[in-house]
């Protein structure tokens, strides 16, 4: 199972079987609209950003309440862009362990572009 399978439209039953929540929106359409008409550039590409603001935007995209993604820029640790964003087409896995012991697994695809602030 690879995140690139999701972007390429190869949504195998294996993802659903394993309990992953997948994006319900057209990732490429959101990416194109964000590139043409950007509305949010976020500085700071760390885990808190990916787990909270990016995940909330992902939910808004899933429900059709919003139609653009976020562009993230990093000004300190460029390695996060080079190793955690770009190799995975800017998608992330959000895994939450709930107090009941249930594990929630979600693919976050709301980040449409990742930049080093020097670019």
Walk through the language-model features, giving the residues of each:
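Non-transmembrane, aqueous-exposed alpha-helical and coiled segments at domain scale
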Residues: 1-118
């Amino acid at each position: 199972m690879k995140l690139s399978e999701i972007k390429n439209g190869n949504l195998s039953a294996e993802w659903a079987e394993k309990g992953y929540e997948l994006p319900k929106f057209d990732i490429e359409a959101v990416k194109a609209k964000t590139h043409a008409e950007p509305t949010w550039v976020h500085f700071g590409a760390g885990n808190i950003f990916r787990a909270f603001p990016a995940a909330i935007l992902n939910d808004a995209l899933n429900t059709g309440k919003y139609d653009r993604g976020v562009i993230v820029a990093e000004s300190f640790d460029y390695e996060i862009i080079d190793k955690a964003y770009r190799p995975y087409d800017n998608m992330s896995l959000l895994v939450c362990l709930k107090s009941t012991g249930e594990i929630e697994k979600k693919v976050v695809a709301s980040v449409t572009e990742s930049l080093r602030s020097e670019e």
